[in-house]
Swiss-Prot record:
Induction: Expressed approximately equally in exponential and stationary phases (at protein level). It is found in: Cell inner membrane. Keywords: Cell inner membrane, Cell membrane, Membrane, Transmembrane, Transmembrane helix. GO terms for cellular component: plasma membrane. The keyword tRNA-binding does not apply. It is a single-pass membrane protein. The chain crosses the membrane at residues 4-24. This is Protein YnaM. Encoded in the Rac prophage. The keyword Amino-acid biosynthesis does not apply.
Length: 37
């Protein structure tokens, strides 16, 4: 039970983190002068 919960939460955190990184990278490459995320 606990291991499944931990793995699920890790997957969710990783997916959100990677999505944020990709969005941030695209935003920087497209708008270098823009500072807001």
């Amino acid at each position: 039970m606990n291991s499944i919960l931990i793995i699920t939460s890790l997957l969710i955190i990783f997916s959100i983190f990677s999505h944020a990184l990709i969005k941030l990278g695209i935003g920087i490459s497209n708008n270098p002068d823009k500072t807001d995320v």
